[in-house]
Amino acid sequence: MIQPTVKMPKKSVKERQQQVLEVLIGLLNSEDGMQRVTTERLAKAVGVSEGALYRYFPSKTKMFEALIERIEQTLTGYINASKRKENTTASTVKAILYTVIEFARKNPGVTRILTGHALMFEDDQLKARVAKFFDGLEFQFANILQMSKLREGKTFEDERALAGYLVNFCEGQFLRLVRSNFSYNQHQHFEKQWALIKPLFE
């Protein structure tokens, strides 16, 4: 008896885009994550031709942009959760710092993008996009500091400067992770580092 041929449904463009991004971040997360991800290498990992990749994204720059946008959305979700959960400005900032750094530790590929190490041979517009990401993070911190006036009656001399300092702290932790090839354990030092930051909120 001849068995009927069952055709597997083709993946939609959106599903293929998702697959490409997952494979891309997988390559960046790997031990070879510091090596340049060429379209040839990416296509091979996805299991399609290089030409097929460009049916899902017009350029590699667009792939990285989509990935950075996803990173931004994920971290914004975590930040909003911390804002809902915590009751004071200090505890909110501490929770966000811890969450952002933990996210960086668990996602080496993401961290390599945000420090620029994964973008060294890519379009300069991606570096501008990463700068925009950090500007957004600074805005989130500044907003939390401004809201403290309504929530706790507390004001800060320069919310933007303090927000910038908090972002610089995050960036420094990212760079330390990359430099140590993610062997650095920031949890051993976080409480002591926070003890130095906390007085800024008292």
Swiss-Prot record:
It comes from the Bacteria. GO terms for cellular component: bacterial nucleoid; cytoplasm. Required for nucleoid occlusion (NO) phenomenon, which prevents Z-ring formation and cell division over the nucleoid. Acts as a DNA-associated cell division inhibitor that binds simultaneously chromosomal DNA and FtsZ, and disrupts the assembly of FtsZ polymers. SlmA-DNA-binding sequences (SBS) are dispersed on non-Ter regions of the chromosome, preventing FtsZ polymerization at these regions. Belongs to the nucleoid occlusion factor SlmA family. PANTHER family: ACREF/ENVCD OPERON REPRESSOR-RELATED, ACREF_ENVCD OPERON REPRESSOR-RELATED. InterPro entries: DNA-bd_HTH_TetR-type_CS, Homeodomain-like_sf, HTH-type_Tx_Regulator, HTH_TetR, NO_SlmA, SlmA-like_C. The keyword Cytoplasm applies. Residues 14-75 form the HTH tetR-type domain. Keywords: Cell cycle, Cell division, Cytoplasm, DNA-binding. Its main location: cytoplasm. Signal peptide: none annotated. It is found in: Cytoplasm, Nucleoid. GO terms for molecular function: sequence-specific DNA binding. One of its GO terms (biological process) is negative regulation of division septum assembly. It comes from Actinobacillus pleuropneumoniae serotype 5b (strain L20). This is Nucleoid occlusion factor SlmA. Homodimer. Interacts with FtsZ. Residues 38-57 bind DNA.
